[in-house]
Amino acid sequence: MLYVQHWSFKTVYHKKGTEKFLAGGGDYPGVEMIGRYHAPGSLEGWIVLKTDDPKAIYQHAAEWAEFLNWKTTPVFTDEEAGQIVAKINS
């Protein structure tokens, strides 16, 4: 399943969070990271993930909870969404 995570730094945690990221804390065990994107000039970004184990996403978010706010959304590709809509419309 695909997921999109939106992250944003909590107030005053940018420096500590970036230090953790640069030290390798951005690794995402148990999850295929399709891409991680950073909004220029801001303190937020997005991660596109693929996994059959949402517990791995929960664990990673919990490890970063001191520094980041998270919003995790399961998403479908156009092909997957099309199949669902086709069933509804049949």
Stretches with model-predicted labels:
Residues 1-90:
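Conserved, structured core segments of small domains
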